[in-house]
Swiss-Prot record:
Pfam families in alphabetical order: PCRF (PF03462), RF-1 (PF00472)
SMART domains listed in its UniProt record: PCRF (SM00937)
Subcellular location as annotated: Cytoplasm
Primary localisation category: cytoplasm
Taxonomy, superkingdom: Bacteria
Entries under PANTHER family matching the protein: LD18447P
Chain's gene name: prfA
Protein name: Peptide chain release factor 1
UniProt PTM: Methylated by PrmC. Methylation increases the termination efficiency of RF1.
GO cellular component annotations of the record: cytoplasm
Keywords, sorted A to Z: Cytoplasm, Methylation, Protein biosynthesis
Family: Belongs to the prokaryotic/mitochondrial release factor family.
Modified-residue entries (N5-methylglutamine), positions: Q233
Cytoplasm as UniProt keyword: yes
Organism of derivation: Oceanobacillus iheyensis (strain DSM 14371 / CIP 107618 / JCM 11309 / KCTC 3954 / HTE831)
């Protein structure tokens, strides 16, 4: 492990030199590429440097113990050694995690697709609640949201809402939200006070760059139509809505959010590229999972991952068996407790696999 850490520090130092080179500074592509690589090494290199410093201090302290010390000095050095040993162990654990293979999509922006599933109007209302929950979480993180397409029910609910989240390491945190989310609550229209169960599905797709997914014009069928609002009424007499069909995969994307056909087509193309990329990723993951299961949960969109029980103010994540009695705060976007636990679970799984 130490040899690998040393080679990473050498690479980090080399990147520092390269980023000071006028030739690189004037080449925006190289500058971006090297800056991104350096940023990815920052945490592990800092941990390794501290580890070397702590190891040196520990060796010095052990040498001191070999000298003739009075009782007071002996106890001081002994306490320092215990403290340094503790810190060294912490850094070793931290570096093991930092050396785990990273998901290449972790630093990407995402498209989120939320759909009301079982439960009719109540499912659509819950889909709206989830959209607002993720919007608030994105706000807390300093991320930016752009709605691509929304099919609202007119009472704060959504049959479907597709939105993009731009920011730092978005996919690394939101990838765990893939799956079916179940809600248990008394609908406002329920006079008897009975608890109803409804479901909404969430899909999280990493943004795909053009170089990652080659989409040929000849493979895309483009249809245009007049956009419509809630209930199907026409809101635009021009043919501004766009439907793209990727013939080889059968993936269809319809966007009518903008008044401009060009803008709708641009948005649809981004979503289409992400869905095609996601399809390839899912197929590759399914093949990998036949031999070994590495992720938290299966990532299956139909897998029930979480239950939100409003009467009891609790949320349970079924993948890790974690229940939190703070539903009101979670619906305000306070998702860190769940996300941190899911990240830790995945890291533990990966460490166990390495040890096998």
């Amino acid at each position: 492990m130490l040899d690998r850490l040393q080679s990473l520090e050498d690479r980090y130092n080399k990147l520092n030199e390269m980023l000071s080179d006028p030739e690189v500074i004037n080449d925006s592509k190289k500058l971006r590429e090297y800056s991104k690589e350096q940023s990815g090494l920052e945490d592990v290199v800092q941990a390794y440097r501290e580890y070397k410093e702590v190891t040196e201090q520990l060796n010095d302290a052990k040498e001191m113990m070999e000298d003739k010390l009075d009782d007071e000095m002996y106890e001081m050095v002994k306490a320092e050694i215990a403290e340094l040993n503790g810190r060294k162990e912490e850094l070793e654990s931290s570096m093991k995690i930092l050396l785990l293979p990273k998901d290449p999509n972790d630093d990407k922006n995402v498209f989120m697709e939320i759909r009301g599933a079982a439960g009719g109007d109540e499912a659509a209302l819950f889909a709206g609640d989830l959209y607002r929950m993720y919007s608030r979480y994105a706000e807390h993180q300093g991320w930016k949201i752009d709605v691509m397409e929304a099919s609202s029910t007119g009472v704060g609910g959504y049959k479907e809402v597709i939105f993009m989240i731009n920011g730092s390491d978005v996919y690394s945190k939101l990838k765990y939200e893939n799956g079916a989310h179940r809600v248990q609550r008394v609908p406002e229209t329920e006079s008897g006070g009975r608890i109803h169960t409804s479901t909404a599905t969430v899909a999280v797709l990493p943004e795909a760059e053009e170089v990652e997914v080659e989409v040929h014009d000849k493979d895309i069928r483009v249809d245009t139509f007049a956009s419509s609002g809630p209930g199907g009424q026409s809101v635009n007499t021009t043919m501004s809505a766009v439907r793209l069909t990727h013939v080889p995969t059968g993936i269809v994307v319809s966007i009518q959010d903008e008044k401009s056909q060009i803008k709708n087509k641009e948005k649809a193309m981004k979503v289409l590229r992400a869905r095609i990329y996601d399809k390839f990723q899912q197929e590759a993951q399914a093949e990998y999972d036949e031999n070994r299961k590495s992720a938290v949960g299966s990532g299956d969109r139909s897998e029930r991952i979480r239950t939100y029980n409003f009467p009891q103010n609790r949320v349970t994540d079924h993948r890790i068996g974690l229940t939190i009695q703070k539903l009101d705060q979670i619906m305000q976007g306070k998702l860190d407790e769940f996300i941190d636990a899911l990240v830790m679970e995945e890291q533990t799984n990966k460490l166990e696999q390495i040890g096998e």
